[in-house]
Amino acid sequence: MPRKTLLPLVPACDAAPRRKRLAAALLAVPGLVPAVSQAQLSGAAAEPQTFGSPWDLRLAPQLDEHPQKQGGKPATFVLADHTGGTADQDLAAKGSAEIRRGNAVVKADAIHYDQDTDMADAYGKVTVANGGTTFSGPEAHLKVEANQGFMTTPKYHFTATGGSGSAERVQLLDSERSVFTNGTYTGCQCSTNPAWYIRGSEFDFDTGADEGVARNGVLFFQGVPLFGSPWLTFPLSGERRSGFLPPTFSPFSSTNGIEVSLPYYFNIAPNRDLTITPHIISKRGIFTQATFRYLSTNYSGALTGEYLPDDRIAHRNRYAIFWQHQQNFGNGFGGYIYYNKVSDNLYPEELGSTNQFVNGIQTVYQQEAGLTYNDGPWSVLGRYQHWQTLPPAVAPYGREPQLNVKYAKYNVGGFDFGAEADYSRFRITTADQPEGDRVMFNPYVSYGLYGPGYFFVPKAQLHIASYDLTTTTGGVPDQAKRFTYSIPTLSLDTGLVFDRSVRLFGQDYIQTLEPRLFYVYTPYRNQSNAPLFDTAVSDFGLAEIFTPNTFVGNDRIADANRLTAALTTRFINPATGDERARFVIAQQYYFTDQRVTLLPTEAPATARHSDLILGASVKLGAGFASETAFQYNVDNNQLVKSSVGFGYSPGERRVINVGYRYTRQNPTLSNEPINQILMSAQWPLTRRLYAVGRLNYDLASSRVVDGLVGFQYDADCWAFGVGVQRYANGLNTSGQQNSSTRVLAQLVLKGLTSIDNGLVTAFRAGVQGYTPLPPAPAPLSRFSNYD
């Protein structure tokens, strides 16, 4: 017998098949079918596309949701195998019965519907769906439009957030709020036997507020209770919200003992938040950390404060302040503040953040505020800069204050010209060091000739520096306090580019041959009176040999009469333009001695040529890449410096890095010799298990500089990681590096929370190319399982 359908106030009619009647009913009520996508088109793209005559079916680019007009009542649709009842009063539907009203759908084996009260009583395999939330159970009693009522022994699923669970009873308050009695909640897609779930005597869910509250809630993982609370709140999705974050636990250490922390997060506004984290340190006391972050269209920043009152070991109050602020005033004006301060010299070693395990202990803290202006060729910086320096670091000079102005114009009739002017007052916290003012002016002009296979760029520049010292180095009699240097520099940078087509290893390439010459001439000027405010010897490498000055900074300008010659060849994929390989060889030739030295006690450089520099970069298929650089002394037949690195990454979360660093000790330079091998990797052992490791081993001393080994397991709705790290932890009394070991762990309950005491941070810093485990899949749209 055909199924019957009945609309309120309309007699039943069973002449048409059920699907056709349902389709006709849906099409007859505009706005009944929600949009399949939240994205909205506009313009011509949003207009329906027609085919043939005006009476043909049309393709619409989107489904539009039309809200119910105020005062209007949506139509009610009833479908079933058998229907009966009294017109305009009640209705009985049996056999695959359905009631649809607005966005609400009730399905059951049998439904009794009272039209006056809008009350539906459903029995047998009941399903209630409204606004992307689905409830199923043996029976339900509710008002259809208001979505108010109750169900017994329901199972539920939030389509928009991915959460699900079961309970003894659910009280439906409206389309967004519901109360469950003696129930469970999980974010796992597998709801029959989830890896984690929360069990509570009562759950209050509000999908509109994206919040769930469990009373007498206990968090279970793999059937084991992890955490319990009489009042447990949690988000239903990944949106930020105020509340407690997962606690962290650090194992016992000789410095601090056991440490436990419990952060609380305040979601003040979409662009502001505050995290307060009390730490219980068994050997020292209660250590509190607070971080305030803010973001606006014109400014952003973060302020962190740390405080430990009456340290039980140090017997004093200890604190730290870290503030970063960026400001855009408009019209090219900006500003910034970097203020960092710790209470004592041992603070970073004993109470520093987890970043110290990766980057080493911080011993220099910047305290700086500045104003900037940028407009076309103009760039202006005014700042006040100070440093807090902890031993054994050497204190740098502060600029108290500095005003720097730069001007640059390009391609004005083929000329590039500009200038830099700078005034700085240098101060230092170290005793018996020179201090004073320096005014510097550096104008320049160049003219470039460029062609398809060549370039020719002569350049002239002038360095003027004037000093007014308030204090000089102790022990130097009659040292001048006011003096000025004026030093010109001429340079010529030129090169050619040849190319040809070649075929190597069955592949076509474009090979280039690029000879380059760089000549620089700077006359000698005695600069021994000038202090070293911001100057040091420049590194010697491919990035530095084409610069006119062998010093960085403005207190030394090297006299020069030298020529740099380099030859580069590259292999380029003609189809994509991707550079597959590059090889470089370069050397400098000196026509006169370099008399200007960093310190007056140093001897002038008398060599006639520099060390030979060789470099290579290779990228092959299947994710293989290599970077190699050598500095070789031809006269002594010695390798001065080398850096060799190989990387292999055939796919995501598959990377192997191998590197070697070598630096020969130079008696004339206070450099530390380096002879180290570095290996790091991330690699899958199974489909879900990954190994991560890093080893930095010093071959000269036969010791581990730093190391890391760990594993990560990725399941459908949870992930776990563990690692052991050996790291540098300051210097001992003899100046040797101390090392310590710590255990790292991470537990991620996807869809709920993550507990991590620095594991992912250590993996990111230790393994180049490391990729974190994937997050939980995004929840489905509320229209994904649309009925």
From Swiss-Prot:
Keywords: Cell outer membrane, Membrane, Signal. It is found in: Cell outer membrane. The keyword Cytoplasm does not apply. Its main location: membrane. InterPro entries: LipoPS_assembly_LptD, LptD, LptD_C. Together with LptE, is involved in the assembly of lipopolysaccharide (LPS) at the surface of the outer membrane. Belongs to the LptD family. This is LPS-assembly protein LptD. It comes from Burkholderia thailandensis (strain ATCC 700388 / DSM 13276 / CCUG 48851 / CIP 106301 / E264).
